[in-house]
């Protein structure tokens, strides 16, 4: 396991306010990951509220008259989390990942505003490189119980808030796999399959993909060094100069593929490796099922 990430799970300093203009409570501690209200139930007087169940209604119905997109003003609790962390000496960059913040969150590092997210169940990432410094740093996350995104989360479930999934710091090495999309196509009689890996890579070096025992690789460099569509080995690199990310595609042919099904969930092992001057920098493993739906 490569030391590219540091978990921030555990005890965080925490205080609470009922809305943006209300005073915050005294500092307490809460556990991350975890819902604020579930931990409030374990404290005398339930100081941070309780879980709220609604099905076909919004939580603010009957309390405040709101139009879609507006958020409650009188009762919209804020939970502010804070903790310190030490930046690893070898890191040249520092990113924060909130894997789940219900329903919205704003982030500060060392008093510098970093960003905002509102999408409860989608991880959010923030670049904190410009705000961190060697040694101890202070991270603050404000979590809002309701946001404009809450209008889209009108499902039949318990309403709670907080950092309910893991929080972590991570760095990106000199060459990094930003994303990968797997596409597949089949012969009409399913006698063969074509599997394409569309990779987004930042930085310069070598990317290698091993699928079904076959290896393909491509050299990627700084985007300005190449023209779009240059082919290296068997991989095709298509630079994206604006985002400093290159698109690299690898295509494999599988004869007589073993298909995936619910009854027989066959999977093909895949490994994507990134190297810099011949040294392994990053490795990602995938399991790919072949199936046409």
Language-model regions, residue ranges each:
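Short glycine/proline/serine/threonine-rich loop/turn segments at secondary-structure transition edges
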Residues: 92, 132-136, 254-267
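Accessory beta-strand-rich segments of carbohydrate-active enzymes
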Residues: 15-17, 43, 51, 71-178, ...
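Surface beta-strand/loop "capping" patches
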Residues: 174-203
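Short strand-edge motifs at loop-to-beta-strand transitions and within beta-strands
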Residues: 81-83, 122-126, 224-226, 246-252
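Beta-strand-rich binding/interaction modules
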Residues: 107-109, 192-235, 248
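Accessory carbohydrate-binding/adhesion or oligomerization-edge regions at the termini
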Residues: 1-60, 138-142, 146
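N-terminal carbohydrate-binding accessory modules
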Residues: 271-293
